[in-house]
A protein has these predicted regions:
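Interfacial/gating helices of multi-pass transporter permease domains
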Residues: 25-48, 104-108, 166, 199-203, ...
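Hydrophobic alpha-helical transmembrane segments
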Residues: 142-189, 356-381
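Hydrophobic faces of transmembrane alpha-helices in multi-pass small-molecule transporters and flippases
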Residues: 1-16, 20, 111-115, 138-145, ...
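Alpha-helical transmembrane segments of multi-pass membrane transporters/permeases
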Residues: 7-11, 68-73, 130-157, 166, ...
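Interhelical loop/hinge segments that connect adjacent transmembrane helices in multipass membrane
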Residues: 1-5, 103-109, 166-216, 379-386
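Alpha-helical transmembrane segments of multi-pass membrane proteins
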Residues: 102-127, 246, 298-324
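Small-residue-rich hydrophobic transmembrane alpha-helices
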Residues: 22, 36-83, 128-133, 233-285, ...
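Short membrane-interface helical motifs at transmembrane helix boundaries
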Residues: 26, 83-108, 281-305
Length: 386
């Protein structure tokens, strides 16, 4: 349980900053601006795709193919791709906002800021991935914490002093860009521009594929949901803000389980009991955050209750799903487990395209239910055969 709390706290630090930042921006400037968090949420999946290929894939490729420059090459190519991709999205920000069925007059400046901030975060994560594979975790965590703190302090302090959205965005982005440039120069020592894109995708293909599906889910799902009106935009933003940290922290269950499985220290009941306790804490924190934030934004109570209830229901499945899926992936069949994980995400993607404001959360529940059934049946059968 201590390890779950320790790893969960590390995740909490990096996840909490953007949440509290957008909550405070909403309080300082305009309540509507909090919705930028969900407006640009799909674009974070693009960051996941780029980091998967040019970060994780490049580092694994370097180790397997004995190319010392692979990680550096990945950072350089990933940075170039990121600048082009997010730059084009920022230049077409109005079209993006219109596609998401939101008001360009309200969201244009801060949406552009958020897109460029995700660009800078992508470059940061490419560099952090290299440090993780060099086993410089403490250094990586310090850099990540420093970036988030600089972003938070600069954005909030400038917003408190200056109400001009354009100036707030420019000042914050300039400081974060300087941070990234300094970090980039210090992190890149030698490059040879050799890069095997096929291998880099192959070595982290599951994560990359899931990020692609997440992008489709949130891009079309949120666009679909937002088309039903402002009350759904506010409700989805509210539900996302009070559950996003907890979803990130719940990955600690998988992390701890995988460590013990690999080291032959795995005890299912011990992990299950700890996961139940940990998930209970996460659900409690969701309810508390909801009670604290609700009076500030006053979203439609019925709609919010539906979204939050379904999130909590999905949280309740986590201990039953994650531990068994980790065990099956490592000890049973990585291929079969991966295929079924992808099937679950395909189900989620298809349902997210349905014409209902609840499409994304319904897809999420259906995906988890499929994994729950698969994990229970396969785990039970596998344990009988060993």
């Amino acid at each position: 349980m201590k390890r779950l709390l320790r790893i969960g706290f590390d995740i909490f630090i990096t996840s909490f900053t953007p949440i509290i930042t957008w909550l405070l921006i909403g309080l300082i400037i305009s309540k509507d601006l909090t919705n930028v968090f969900t407006l640009t949420y799909p674009l974070q999946c693009l960051m996941g795709i780029i980091v998967s290929i040019f970060g994780v894939g490049a580092n694994i490729s370097g180790i397997k193919n004995k190319n010392k420059n692979s990680a550096n090459n990945g950072i350089v190519y990933g940075t170039i791709i990121s600048i082009i991709l997010f730059g084009l999205i920022a230049l077409n920000c109005k079209n993006y906002i219109n596609f998401m069925n939101m008001n360009t007059d309200i969201y244009l400046i801060f949406c552009t800021y958020s897109i460029l901030q995700i660009l800078l975060q992508t470059i940061l994560h490419l560099i952090l991935t290299k440090l993780y594979y060099l086993e410089l975790n403490k250094k990586a965590n310090k850099i990540s914490f420093l970036f988030n703190i600089i972003n938070f302090i600069t954005l909030i302090s400038v917003a408190a002093l200056i109400k001009n959205q354009l100036l707030i965005s420019i000042i914050t982005l300039v400081i974060l860009t300087l941070f990234d440039i300094i970090l980039f120069v210090k992190s890149i020592d030698k490059i040879d521009f050799k890069f095997n894109l096929k291998n880099c995708f192959k070595y982290d293909s599951v994560s990359c594929s899931i990020s692609i599906m997440y992008f489709i889910i949130y891009l079309f799902g949120f666009s679909n949901s937002f088309s039903f009106g402002e009350k759904y935009v506010v409700a989805i933003t509210f539900a996302t803000l009070i559950t996003d940290i907890q979803w990130d922290m719940s990955t600690a269950i998988k992390t701890v389980a995988k460590i013990d499985i690999v080291k032959n220290k795995f005890d299912y009941m011990e992990h299950f009991k700890n996961a139940i306790k940990f998930t209970s804490l996460l659900i409690t924190s969701v309810i508390l955050m909801g009670l604290i934030v609700y009076p500030i934004y006053n979203p439609n109570l019925l709609i919010v209750c539906i979204f939050v209830f379904l999130h909590i229901l999905d949280f309740a499945m986590t201990p039953f799903n994650n531990i068994k899926m980790c065990y099956l992936e490592i000890e049973h069949s990585p291929t079969k487990t991966t295929i079924n994980t992808i099937i679950a995400y395909i189900i989620r993607t298809v349902i997210s395209l349905l014409p209902t404001p609840f499409c994304t959360i319904i897809g999420q529940i259906c995906s988890s239910t499929y994994e729950l059934i698969y994990a229970k049946i396969t785990y039970k059968h596998f344990k009988k055969t060993i």
